[in-house]
Regions:
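Canonical Radical SAM [4Fe-4S] cluster-binding loop centered on the CxxxCxxC motif
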Residues: 1-6, 171
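Catalytic cores of large soluble enzymes that bind and process phosphate-bearing ligands
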Residues: 2, 133, 175
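Conserved AdoMet/S-adenosylmethionine-binding subsite of the radical SAM
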Residues: 8-11, 15-169
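C-terminal accessory region of radical SAM enzymes
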Residues: 121-123, 179-193
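Short amphipathic alpha-helical surface patches that serve as generic macromolecular interface elements
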Residues: 138-142, 177-184
């Protein structure tokens, strides 16, 4: 389930981990909206820690990485702007139909592409290849990234694991070797990998 995060305690932990050699803070979350308040308070606590103590500033200025499903509001994006150094963003579906069917979200393409464009200078995009979705999802995703974001870092991922998808037998399996090759060929064909 998790626990309520204390921003001051998190800031002290980030500082301690940085001294021990941590090179970034990775905010992992799917949808960031419920966590934005904690992220912002933690960043403020880090700044306060520097002013209130003799903490070494080198260890307080740790790059902030936001690891997200990229499906969030414009308000959330504005709050995170200037706080997050690198966006590690998932671009899972290449169309609204698949996003609605499997993730039950509306306006997926509009939302995700808007957020990708907004964070494009500090961005790495990940695309999880799903079984049977090379043409409907991988192809359009790769094409959009290639057309819109020429210099972005792009990662094609094959570790899809079926979980709680018995209602969707078409994706209730691992990605086959043939599907891996097909997705790789799509990305290579557009010079994205």
């Amino acid at each position: 389930m998790g626990s309520i995060a204390d921003a001051d305690a998190l800031a002290r932990r980030i500082y301690a981990r940085s001294i021990a050699g941590a090179r970034n803070v990775n905010w992992v979350g799917g949808d960031p909206t419920p966590h934005i308040d904690t992220i912002l308070k933690t960043m403020r606590a880090l700044a306060d820690l520097e002013q209130e103590t003799e903490a070494d500033a080198r260890f307080l200025n740790v790059p902030m990485v936001f690891n997200s499903n990229t499906y969030y509001s414009t308000e959330a994006a504005k709050l995170l702007d200037g706080v997050i150094d690198v966006y590690l963003s998932d671009f899972k579906y290449g169309n609204d139909r698949c996003a609605k069917r499997y993730s039950h979200v509306d306006k997926y393409m509009e939302t995700v592409t808007r957020n990708l464009v907004a964070s494009q200078h500090r961005l790495m995009i990940r695309h999880l290849v799903m079984p049977g979705h090379a043409q409907c999802c991988t192809g359009p995703t790769v094409a959009w990234v290639r057309e819109t974001m020429r210099d972005v870092k792009f990662n094609l991922m094959f570790q899809y694991t079926p979980y709680n998808v018995t209602d969707y037998p078409e994706i209730n399996r691992f990605v086959s070797d043939a599907e891996r090759r097909e997705a790789t060929n799509i990305a290579k064909g557009l010079n994205l990998i």
